[in-house]
Amino acid sequence: MDLPGPIHDFLLVFLGSGLLVGGLGVVLLPNPIFSAFSLGFVLVCISLLYILSNSHFVAAAQLLIYVGAINVLIIFAVMFMNDSEYSTDFNLWTVGDGITSLVCTTILFSLISTILDTSWYGVIWTTRLNQLLEQDLISNSQQIGIHLSTDFFLPFELISIILLVALVGAISVARQ
């Protein structure tokens, strides 16, 4: 999306804040319905970030697959659960929550320090990609495949990790 710098920066900060608030809602809300809606909000913010970075196909796939199908499936499964156990006796902080938050915070800071200490200028991107895309012999679906396996490989993998975490969380909530 071709926006002026300040508007682009504002939208980036706004969507990033939405991601943080939604992620905290997924983790901290005691009611699984509210947590599932918060997950839907996070997935919509991710698709809007893809629109902001001019990858409209990935944004549409994000909305259709994750928000439209997976999140609706999670909400549908949570609706069948007995919700009386969530409305009574809610402890805000337990020992297991403290240990988990300590481990997650340690992993977060180690990832941040690794990202900041890595020289990203030495990463060599493929030069053959531009030559392949300039040819008219490649169809649109092949171009999408090339972009997903080169330019958008990291966001594509991050989406799959988010889906895996969401499904594991939904299964663990359903088993309780």
Swiss-Prot record:
Entry keyword annotation includes NADP: yes
Function per UniProt: NDH shuttles electrons from NAD(P)H:plastoquinone, via FMN and iron-sulfur (Fe-S) centers, to quinones in the photosynthetic chain and possibly in a chloroplast respiratory chain. The immediate electron acceptor for the enzyme in this species is believed to be plastoquinone. Couples the redox reaction to proton translocation, and thus conserves the redox energy in a proton gradient.
GO molecular function: NADH dehydrogenase (ubiquinone) activity; quinone binding
Entry-linked InterPro entries: NAD(P)H-Q_Oxidoreduct_6, NADH_UbQ/plastoQ_OxRdtase_su6, Nuo/plastoQ_OxRdtase_6_NuoJ
Family: Belongs to the complex I subunit 6 family.
Subcellular location: Plastid, Chloroplast thylakoid membrane
Subunit structure: NDH is composed of at least 16 different subunits, 5 of which are encoded in the nucleus.
Keyword Transmembrane helix part of the UniProt annotation: yes
Record EC number: 7.1.1.-
Biological source species: Lobularia maritima
Highest taxon listed in the record's lineage: Eukaryota
Membrane spanning residue stretches: 10-30, 32-52, 61-81, 92-112, 152-172
Record-given protein name: NAD(P)H-quinone oxidoreductase subunit 6, chloroplastic
Enzyme class: translocase
Predominant place of localization: plastid
Matching PANTHER family: NAD(P)H-QUINONE OXIDOREDUCTASE SUBUNIT 6, CHLOROPLASTIC
Alphabetical keyword list: Chloroplast, Membrane, NAD, NADP, Plastid, Plastoquinone, Quinone, Thylakoid, Translocase, Transmembrane, Transmembrane helix, Transport
